[in-house]
């Protein structure tokens, strides 16, 4: 059983997907499973996921026949997860190389039901200042 099941809803994010998956496959904690739910993407996202899954058996890809939205995609991922812990990552996110290892250490030292960790927003040109401020205020205690 994997220590951490990482669930990623994927919908039309071919531009960001490789960086996301590469950051997960390069984690210092290798005892992970990565469950990607391709939510009926119309771009090359599904093919990108299949290519990664063919090269690394920690990757599992579920292809939805029709778009079900982020929440239902996450629920589908949870039902297929085998890890001791479940982690959600969005398909345009990427993690520092030791993130999973550090999170697992925190979870074993401080048994909690939910762990939320710091976020850094690297906004592209299409993100308004209002949204940047909302994200910053949301993640700041």
What are these regions (language model features)?
Residues 1-141:
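Nucleotide-sugar donor-binding/catalytic module of glycosyltransferases
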